[in-house]
Amino acid sequence: MTTPPGVLALVTVAALWGALAGALLPRAAHRFAVPWEERDGGWRATCPGGHPIRGWLGPARCARCAERRSGRPADTGPAAPAAPYASGAVRLPLLTAVVCAALAAATGVRPELVVWLLLAPAGVLLAAVDLRVRRLPDPLTLPLAAAALVLLGPAALLPEHAGHWTTALLGALALGAGYLALHLANPGGMAFGDVKLALSMGAVLGWYGWATVMLGTFAAFLLGALYGGALAVAGRAGRRTMIAFGPFMLAGTLAGLLVGAYTA
């Protein structure tokens, strides 16, 4: 079976968008990756060398750190290339490109694809931050939930859409309530940041119906359990070991969304 040229072009454009958007994430990932014990500061304002960081988007590189490492003042010749102060320069664009390409392939030419492509970089950013410091910052989780519902509103008014805004709203409320119940029952096992992220998950998955909500939720817990089990077997984790659950929530959401979009 050959891939139609239109679909191939759509996937290619989506992958390019993902790569470009992902290339802007390393600096934001560094700034938001504040450990829990330092959270009162909100976010990082300096690189590890103590130099101020300008802006939120772009590569995580510092020209002043490069000058210090080279031992050459900036006014003695050509400026040294800016030195990286955080990882992700390759991984984040690549991952975002793959995610966006997969979403385009599954969704096709539908209005909601624009929403998925706009939300995907934020999801990758959240996963990167949670993996680094096991924390999901409020400035990312809550606006993401609001953005999902706001953006899906116009999509529901356009022809050829394959979802429902009402179930997106109800999905956000239902999944948020479910995660809140888990948090109240076991605060040490389910962080409140996961509860806020669940609002976005429910909105995105709910667009394609309750079956997609259940599939994405199940996939998140399955992936998290498999990862935790693998760590336990390897002797790297015990019953009280805390793991970042946000990336598995996002991966489960992606899996459910791909299935929901493809079968819609």
PLM region spans:
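A membrane-topology feature that recognizes alpha-helical transmembrane segments
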Residues: 1-264
